[in-house]
Design a protein with these regions (language model features):
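Short hydrophobic alpha-helices and adjacent helix-cap/hinge residues
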Residues: 21-317
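Bacterial N-terminal signal peptides that target proteins for export
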Residues: 1-8
């Protein structure tokens, strides 16, 4: 069943029907949550907390194990597949999980990159991810900072992931953001796209490049955090050509792997006070970006727990 909430996709592979979900299964295999980031990080912490609270309310009895990949910058990306393999290798045989919950883009991408090698595939839920992905490189690359991967959409490109039973997936609408820019600023000739040195930044840039092919009259200027510090990107922003509009994708980590919060986008804003700015992701919205077509961001931990129990009940009877 496919349910649409704005651009947030929640999907399941079985028709929803009334059922008792409060009885605990006799099978005590755990639920394994694999996080991209430290579980203490705010969004991850809130999602896990809401999940566990609702899971307990619904009568869930299985142990919940949390593993952390502790992903940082995109320069580490060739290591993530092996990290996922090592985590999953701890839960084999009688200890295999009843269900895997993947939280975050990096955990999701790492799972996709090595799922074909898994001998036993258990039901999977993904959350805090987007529909557009790039397939992780299998080996260390010399020029990872200039790698231009293809954007793949798990819906449009029909990826075959039968064990994926449910997901809370954001879909970024770059095309409508560009059309909004053209409607407000019809003289636009260039779009400067800002992305950072994270997996999320690389995937969003790949999507941006793909969608810009629909607009051959527009020039795309990439402001890539894999090759910029906050200081060099501010200097580049000061030298943008006329009739440019800025689109802010994401900014957390620069080429030196320094972490920045809102102060970085404030510095960018101060460098470009007269250039219109939009965002497809809500980054800088309200103080720099004047608008954007956004996913329907909201808390989903409680709904994830409902899906978990429903899926396990469906499988175990």
């Amino acid at each position: 069943m496919l349910r649409f909430l704005g651009y947030l996709f929640i999907f399941s592979l079985w028709l929803l029907q009334s059922m008792e979900i409060f009885a605990a299964s006799k099978d005590k295999n755990p639920i394994l949550i694999i996080c991209s980031y430290n579980p203490a990080a705010h969004q991850t912490s809130v999602t896990i907390s809401d999940y566990m609270e609702e899971y307990n309310k619904l009568g869930g009895k299985r142990d919940i194990i949390i593993e952390n990949m502790n992903c940082k910058s995109f320069s580490e990306s060739p290591l993530w597949s092996d990290m996922m393999t090592q985590i999953l290798s701890k839960y084999k045989g009688e200890n295999h999980p009843a269900q895997i919950v993947l939280l975050g883009q990096e955990a999701w991408a790492a799972y996709l990159s090595q799922r074909d090698s898994m001998q036993v595939k258990v039901p999977v839920i993904c959350s805090l991810v987007s529909s557009n992905v790039v397939i992780l490189p299998k080996d260390t690359m010399e020029h990872l900072d200039s790698w231009m991967p293809e954007s793949v959409d798990i819906f449009d490109d029909h990826l075959n992931i039968p064990e994926l039973k449910s997901g809370f997936i954001n879909r970024y609408n770059i095309e409508d953001n560009i059309r909004m820019i053209q409607a407000f600023y019809p003289k636009t000739e260039h779009i400067a796209f800002i992305s950072d040195n994270t997996y999320g930044g690389v995937t969003m840039q790949a999507l941006m490049r793909k969608e810009m092919e629909k607009f051959p009259d527009l020039d795309l200027i990439l402001m890539d955090g894999r090759r910029h510090t906050i200081y060099t990107i501010v200097e580049e922003l000061r030298n943008l050509p006329e009739n440019t509009v800025i689109m802010v994708g994401t900014w957390r980590v620069d080429m030196n792997e320094g972490y920045f919060m809102r102060n970085a986008t404030y510095a960018m804003m101060e460098a470009t006070p007269a250039i219109p700015t939009f965002t497809p992701s809500s980054v800088s919205l309200g103080y720099w970006a004047i608008g954007g077509v956004l996913p329907d961001y909201r808390k989903v931990g409680g709904e994830m727990a409902m899906e978990s129990i429903w899926i396990i009940r469906r499988i175990t009877g």
